């Protein structure tokens, strides 16, 4: 039976989806370049940045589920989610800017390594808290915006289209705007912060809350966590999504190093008769993945409609693992470009096919508890996937240390790397990516909420929500 909820207006769908551009831009630029900036440009040792990344992951273990729980239990005249989004938006944008351009430090802050390290730690934690509060509440609205399966699929696809553009901006513009020595990153940070602000405001304007979703109070915090962790399907989903998020983070963080040293992008080259400088090559290399992902969205959407999001996601894991192995072989920009474009075809499926599974999980949970607990589920999901930062940071620190990676020094922008370090960069880019996606495929094998069972859950949840709406 179709959903009895009011249809979601096109303007709300477009505005809500537009928020994905700023979400993806800020996250992608941060994950792709912030470690490169502090290690390779500002000279902080990789092992210390790895420690900060581990602390950052533990911090997420606290703020993600708490943010979700607070949101689930919030009751105001403006709703549960929107007040949190309003309060976190401006601090999010300010801390995003300060990540790139240390306050009072100028383009080349004359700070000690210890000062930069503690500044980095403080701003990362503040930025992450604000980002988590906004994005968790914005994401938690996804199942609430519509209960209709077709509209959910369309809304998810729309979000990911905007997300692709955000990812493109986040990976392509920073090296172009900042320059080879990153001395222009102040202007870069200002522009990216402005685009992020506008996009998140649009996402806020498109957000729509349904009063029946707040009709029943959520259980206390400990009980909420316990219920979530007893959900077998959710646990298998968390394992798979952790691996998928590691892939996004690991590739984003490794590609700048891989491009500079493995592909030897240190000067101009020619592509289709055009001369590209090193900065533009870096941008094109990363942009190729997302440009390939855009047309592939239609293919993955068709596969999801035909076979279900669950089966399509498992297939995306396998194709992604197969193409990731290719990263072991290129040694030139042109060959690397083929690899990122091929991986982009699978990237589209990995990006768009996880949220529909969480929506089904929250629908089934409502049937069991009577309460809508998107905040807790997305918060717990945020907690677990943030451990991808810990995994990525630790692996990067270990690989760089063990393989003998050489940091640039004064007057030496392109130090000669030993063969062991080059292999380590190939391992970070291709090997760990392939292994993580195989692990995600295995985890999804334990997820049972798909097919006829998922359709039955959606139908029963829609009927329950209709009864709640009539009782208001």
List the predicted regions and their residue ranges.
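Membrane-embedded alpha-helical bundles of multi-pass transporters/translocases
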Residues: 2-472
């Amino acid at each position: 039976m179709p959903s009895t909820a009011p249809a979601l207006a096109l303007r709300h769908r477009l505005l809500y989806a537009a928020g994905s551009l700023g979400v993806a831009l800020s996250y992608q630029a941060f994950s792709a370049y912030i470690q490169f900036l502090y290690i390779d440009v500002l000279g902080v040792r990789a092992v210390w940045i790895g420690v900060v990344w581990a602390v950052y992951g533990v911090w997420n273990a606290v703020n993600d589920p708490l943010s979700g729980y607070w949101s689930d239990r919030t009751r105001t005249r403006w709703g549960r989610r929107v007040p949190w989004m309003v309060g976190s938006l401006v601090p999010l944008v300010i801390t995003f800017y300060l990540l790139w351009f240390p306050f009072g430090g100028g383009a080349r802050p004359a700070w000690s390594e210890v000062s930069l390290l503690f500044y980095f730690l403080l701003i990362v934690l503040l930025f992450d808290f604000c980002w988590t509060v906004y994005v968790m509440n914005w994401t938690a609205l996804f199942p609430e915006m519509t209960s209709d399966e077709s509209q959910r699929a369309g809304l998810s696809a729309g979000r990911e289209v905007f997300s692709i553009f955000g990812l493109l901006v986040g990976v392509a513009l920073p090296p172009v705007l900042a320059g080879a020595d990153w001395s222009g990153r102040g202007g870069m940070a200002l522009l990216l912060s402005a685009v992020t602000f506008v996009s998140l405001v649009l996402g806020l304007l498109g957000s729509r809350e349904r009063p029946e979703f707040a009709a029943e109070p959520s259980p206390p915090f400990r009980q909420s966590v316990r219920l979530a962790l007893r959900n077998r399907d959710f646990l298998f989903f968390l394992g798979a999504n952790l691996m998928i998020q590691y892939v996004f983070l690991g590739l984003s963080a490794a590609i700048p190093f891989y491009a500079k040293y493995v592909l030897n992008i240190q000067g101009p080259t020619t592509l289709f008769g055009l001369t590209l400088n090193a900065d533009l090559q870096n941008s094109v290399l990363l942009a190729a993945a997302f440009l390939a992902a855009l047309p592939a969205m239609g293919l993955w959407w068709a596969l999801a409609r035909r076979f279900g999001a669950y089966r399509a996601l498992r297939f995306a894991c396998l194709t992604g693992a197969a193409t990731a192995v290719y990263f072991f072989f290129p040694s030139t920009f042109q060959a690397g470009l083929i690899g990122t474009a091929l991986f982009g075809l699978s990237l589209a499926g990995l990006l768009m096919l996880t949220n529909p599974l969480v929506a089904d999980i929250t629908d089934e949970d409502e049937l069991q508890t009577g309460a809508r607990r998107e905040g807790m589920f997305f918060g717990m999901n945020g907690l677990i996937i943030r451990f991808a930062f810990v995994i990525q940071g630790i692996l990067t620190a270990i690989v760089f240390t063990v393989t003998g990676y050489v940091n640039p020094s004064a007057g030496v922008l392109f130090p000669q790397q030993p063969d062991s370090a080059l292999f380590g960069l190939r391992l970070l880019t291709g090997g760990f990516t392939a292994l993580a996606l195989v692990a995600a495929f295995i985890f999804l094998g334990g997820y049972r909420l798909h097919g006829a069972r998922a359709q039955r859950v959606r139908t029963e949840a829609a009927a329950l929500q209709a009864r709640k709406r009539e009782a208001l």
